[in-house]
Amino acid sequence: MNLLTKERGLAYVQLARIDKPIGTLLLLWPTLWALWLAAGGLPDLWTLLVFVVGVFLMRSAGCVINDYADRNFDGHVKRTAGRPLPMGKVKPREVLALFAVLALISFALVLTMNSLTIALSFAALLLAVCYPFMKRYIPIPQLVLGMAFSWSIPMAYAAQANALPLVAWLVFLANLLWTIAYDTQYAMVDRDDDLKLGLKSSAILFGRHDKRIIGVLQLATLLILLAVGQLMGLGAWYYWGLLGAAALFVYQQRLIRERQREACFQAFLNNNYAGALVFIGLVLNYLLP
């Protein structure tokens, strides 16, 4: 393999964020919550495999189309200036081709599911494509991101139970609010650059109330997940998981208190552990009732 081929391969890895799995994990945890809740324990193994692989593929596809949408802005933002497109390592048409390949493979997997899941997948694709452009038009693009990152929840219920009960939409709402909270932490890192470029974000919209609103969103997330536990008759392990997530949310508030870029980014990353704790609590609930 020559140097040019290696560089091109690395550029594709960077476009798909294979080297930065945090987004995949933040999408994966609520998907797993939904699968376990819908199945009342370990879900069907093929369904589990399809959703785990699908999460990886669609998160990568979302990152690819995001870089295409932001190709004229990323070079002016400190955090994103080194991405493949602003660096000229790949051409825009190559980025679109990679997105198409990832989306088509994902759709091929979805075709092995039932008709309700297939129907819901079209909305998932629409949300993935629309989100990157929202920061130009709406004051809180994180709302659309939250919908995109939560859409796997009704899809998981559809695939596992062929139904969309109330609890599916409660988990959807909890994850939507959580996504807005952690992506606001992420947006706090880029706030100054976004203001210069005229882009919109929840961090800009919330202004000096950002920390307080993040806290309210985190509390609402926990309360809704608490209601889910009550509706599903879940046991102590689940609530211990929620308590662990609550402790991490308090820690995140400490991290963002001075609004320093690196600390805000660390708070964002910490959400991976919060999602994992809720999932561990769910698994233990069904393993050790």
Curated annotation (Swiss-Prot):
Enzyme Commission number(s) from the entry: 2.5.1.39
The gene coding this protein: ubiA
Gene3D superfamilies tied to this protein: UbiA prenyltransferase
Source organism of the structure: Aeromonas salmonicida (strain A449)
One Pfam match: UbiA
Subcellular location: Cell inner membrane
Protein name: 4-hydroxybenzoate octaprenyltransferase
GO biological process, one term: ubiquinone biosynthetic process
Chain's role: Catalyzes the prenylation of para-hydroxybenzoate (PHB) with an all-trans polyprenyl group. Mediates the second step in the final reaction sequence of ubiquinone-8 (UQ-8) biosynthesis, which is the condensation of the polyisoprenoid side chain with PHB, generating the first membrane-bound Q intermediate 3-octaprenyl-4-hydroxybenzoate.
Claim: Transferase is one of the keywords in the record: yes
Pathway: Cofactor biosynthesis; ubiquinone biosynthesis
